[in-house]
Amino acid sequence: MAETLEPSLVGEIDTSAPFESVREAATRFGGFGFWKPSSLNISEASQNEVGMVLKASELEKELIEKEGETLKVLKSLESTKAIVEELKSKIQNKEDKENCDMNVFKELNQAKMNLCKTTKDLAAIRVSVGLLNKRLEEERAALEKTRERLNSENAAEMSMEIQRLSYEAKEFSRTGENVRYAVNKAVAEIEQTRNKIEAAEMRLIAARKMKEAARAAEAVAIAEIKAVTRRGRRRRRGGNGEETMQEEILETIDETAREIRSSRRTLEEGLAKMEAEEGNWWWTEQRRRSSCSAKFKNPPYMMDVKGLNMMMNGDGTSSSVAVLKPTMSIGQILSRKLLLADESAMMMNGRVSLGQILGKTNFGDREKEKRFNGKRKRFGFANLSVMLNKESKKKNKKKKIALNLSC
């Protein structure tokens, strides 16, 4: 709009106030004067008044015209002010646009700097990524080599493990066969032991009966000894026959004492050998059981001679389910019940039982009995048949020994 109005303007526009007072307007449009009445020249005054009125009317017309011009000028001034304001706003907008352009330029420069920095960082990152990719490839190659090596080693180890397991399976099968054979052998030995124990029990019963018979015979012998002592006392009163009788009695006592000592030593040696053989047999049995139990994870359940379940402990000892008294060997039973008790009692009383007298044997006969009665010796009955065979031979000596002991 300002561009369209600029060519129509001819001169400058005075925007100041046109009139500050009436005096200035009068001075501008014809001057100013003072009125003086004159009595002398009234006509001239009237004429002057008419002329003044005319001039005033003209001046009013001019004033009206000037006011119209002034209004036009004011209107043009207002339009000019509007144009100036519009121009100022346009200038301000242009300045703002220039400032915006500067800001945008600065932002563009900053963005360029950031882009350069980012490109540098990106180049460094690309270099580091390349190094990492290279290292990753190297690690993958090493991993593949390691995997191949492990696969080859695992194959070799698996083959060795399979061979070892097959060998262990064969060993276990052999061990199972050996254990089966050992179990069968142990069952057979248990059956034999059971039969031997039954025979030993029968022999023990026979020995007890023999002991009772020996005690009865001992009582008879004591009665005979008492009778003989009475006769000896009667004969002492007679004279020389008494001295010979005493000498015979002393010789018989000495011989009997020597026989008792030898028989005791023989009996102790036989008992020691019997206990040693039983201990050896028991030790081998325990060792066999412990070796059989060590080959298996589960402890084997075994049966003793009475049919009770027995379990082998870790120390090689056996424990049965039913709590029993500690078992003793047959030799220990015989040595405690048949020999030791009677021997100690008779030695304290100064007497010897008939069973101890009958227990004396010769070494030659014992060697024969070893060949024929080897199994009996384990259970303490090696001398039983010898005692039965020699019982008749010693009846004569028995009377003499009993007589000497009673004296």
UniProtKB/Swiss-Prot annotation:
<feature type="coiled-coil region">
    <location>
        <begin position="72"/>
        <end position="99"/>
    </location>
</feature>
<protein>
    <recommendedName>
        <fullName>WEB family protein At3g51720</fullName>
    </recommendedName>
</protein>
<comment type="similarity">
    <text>Belongs to the WEB family.</text>
</comment>
<feature type="coiled-coil region">
    <location>
        <begin position="247"/>
        <end position="278"/>
    </location>
</feature>
<dbReference type="Pfam" id="PF05701">
    <property type="entry name" value="WEMBL"/>
</dbReference>
<feature type="coiled-coil region">
    <location>
        <begin position="128"/>
        <end position="217"/>
    </location>
</feature>
<dbReference type="InterPro" id="IPR008545">
    <property type="entry name" value="Web"/>
</dbReference>
<keyword id="KW-0175">Coiled coil</keyword>
